[in-house]
Amino acid sequence: MANLERNKQTVIAFITRAFNDKLPADAVAQYVGSQYIQHDPQSPDGAEAFVQFATGFAGQFPQLHIDIKRVIAEGDLVVAHLLITMMPEDRGMAGVEIFRLQDSKIVEHWNVLQPVPEQAANDNTMF
């Protein structure tokens, strides 16, 4: 049980450091393993590629903020449900990020993103 909680805290810290604090190189140094496998079709494999991507993204969207709504862990996987906004007035995007950890380090990543619509077919939120 302690390992699951540690993995959740690792993912929370990684997302916060890389995107909200705008320090992706620091996040990679602290929380990513020597191999980083990327399944996002817009991002290449490798820790250095992630740093370049996140640095460019932060430059393009300096007000980017990720609100972590929930984090779930099972085995070596951690799933984070996120609200991602590019600027404060933005409705944002709902994100589901899946991380695989090995020895308390992030080694693999998948994600699915969906814009938050102006109107929904129900009265529920995406969060």
For each feature predicted by the language model, list its residue ranges.
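C-terminal and inter-domain tail/linker signature
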Residues: M1-F127
